[in-house]
Amino acid sequence: MALYLSEKDVRKLLTVEMALEAVESAHRDLAEGLAVDVPRARSRLPQTVLHILQGALPAQGVIGYKAYTSNRSGNRFLVHVFDSATGVLRGVLEADFLGMMRTGAASAVASRYLAPKGSVVAGVFGAGWQAEGHIRTLCAALPMQSIKVCARDADKLTNFCARLETEMGVRVRPSNPEETVRESDIVGTVTTSATPLFQEGWLKPGVHLNGAGSNALIRQEISEAVIRRCAPIVVDSIPTALAEAGDLLPLLEKGRLHARQLVELGDIIIGRHPGRVDDQAMSLFESQGLAIQDLALAKRVLDAAELAGLGQNWPLQMES
């Protein structure tokens, strides 16, 4: 019998460490040819957009998809997980928190492999739901000592930083754009900005950048000048990046960047690509989000739910 897990169930079961391990395993499987990932498809109406990501991790025993709607009233996320050997439905998970944690985990895993040695200071643009996931996962992946956060809403930013500092025991403080970037070992962008968030001259040598908000051509968080200085330029999936990476698409269209220059995160994880080779060079990870990240994490949450006896039996029984 399949399980249905609510947001409340998922929050009880999902840990930061689980998210980091799941996302890294998904990228490893993809690099080793043990995964199938289909780029996001969208059906658009004036009021509502339906987004679907699908994929499979047969070595982990799962195949499935995430479907979510975006509307002025909010977003709604569901992940459907099937047994890859039998095709039987294993579970349906409400996936707002799950998606937040897997998105943050992708940038955190990339930082673990690409950030300069001894990284302890990070700057983050954004003080919303996804920014929180980035900060929590980054602090679990690396021994961060200080997080500087920049956002437009001053009151929201102050409350956001105070809450995370109290909950995490790491210094989290409000900052302006320049202070957020200067002297940061890692800089993350988690916004919907249509224009670059910081100037090239503010970045210190060797900084690692995580771009996670620019998943459409109309969005651009990181300037072309900054991107052209980065090596390597790492993506979660080249096909997905070529379709959605708003930071990269203008450079690709102008011929100032070529697809062959892009490196998939999984290739660095398995050692096929060396990753950072120059301590003074800037590195960049562009995160768009993959179905296999959701599936790997959902599988682990389902396993934990079965052990803990959480969740509801899915009410529909399919005829054989």
Where are these regions (language model features)?
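N-terminal ligand-binding/catalytic initiation module
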Residues: 1-100, 108, 115-118, 292-295, ...
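Short helix-loop-beta connector
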Residues: 114-121, 143, 204-205
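Conserved beta-strand elements of the Class I
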Residues: 122-123, 283
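Glycine-rich Rossmann-fold phosphate-binding loop(s) that bind the pyrophosphate
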Residues: 127-128
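N-terminal Rossmann-fold NAD(P) dinucleotide-binding loop
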Residues: 131-132
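NAD(P)-binding Rossmann-fold cofactor-contacting core
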Residues: 141-165
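Rossmann-like adenosine-cofactor binding region
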Residues: 169-253
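Adenosine-phosphate binding glycine-rich loop
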Residues: 219-320
